Amino acid sequence: MAVAAVKWVMSKRTILKHLFPVQNGALYCVCHKSTYSPLPDDYNCNVELALTSDGRTIVCYHPSVDIPYEHTKPIPRPDPVHNNEETHDQVLKTRLEEKVEHLEEGPMIEQLSKMFFTTKHRWYPHGRYHRCRKNLNPPKDR
């Protein structure tokens, strides 16, 4: 049994050598077409293919090419204060002009009373007299 297994492994290895022969350090496939296609010249990386010493792994090395500073452009960044379009900065932060305005309590209470159809007294805070007399531990309902 052991001899048959060794022969089968040896024969399998020879079959793989015939199916995937190595020529000049590159993998040469007899039965399949290669899917490798050369990249255009203006592509931003150099591709190099290699085979490991045991012949089992194909290694692809593709470092990015350095672009000279003369060929770059600055990223346009619109001013968030004077830009009419809604930007990410405007969504997360209030505009600088709105920060200058002092928020008063009067208009907010009027807006809330109009929005919820209530009187203005509902939105003012309770005084100390009423807060002291509030029962903090009310009895549970049955």
Swiss-Prot record:
The protein's predominant localisation is: mitochondrion
Q: Which Pfam families match?
A: MRP-S32
| InterPro entries assigned to the protein according to its UniProt record, in alphabetical order | Ribosomal_mL42 (IPR019346)
Q: Does the keyword Flavoprotein apply?
A: no
Give the UniProt subcellular location, in the record's own words.
Answer: Mitochondrion
GO annotation terms (biological process):
mitochondrial translation; translation
The record places the transit peptide at 1-32
A single GO CC term for this protein reads: mitochondrial inner membrane
UniProt keywords (A-Z) are: Mitochondrion, Ribonucleoprotein, Ribosomal protein, Transit peptide
Q: Would you say which domain of life the source belongs to?
A: Eukaryota
Q: Name one GO molecular function term.
A: structural constituent of ribosome
Assembly description:
Component of the mitochondrial large ribosomal subunit (mt-LSU). Mature mammalian 55S mitochondrial ribosomes consist of a small (28S) and a large (39S) subunit. The 28S small subunit contains a 12S ribosomal RNA (12S mt-rRNA) and 30 different proteins. The 39S large subunit contains a 16S rRNA (16S mt-rRNA), a copy of mitochondrial valine transfer RNA (mt-tRNA(Val)), which plays an integral structural role, and 52 different proteins.
Name the protein family. Answer: Belongs to the mitochondrion-specific ribosomal protein mL42 family.
The molecule here is called Large ribosomal subunit protein mL42
> Which source organism does the UniProt entry give?
Homo sapiens
- Lineage, uppermost ranks: Eukaryota, Metazoa, Chordata, Craniata, Vertebrata
Gene name of the record = MRPL42
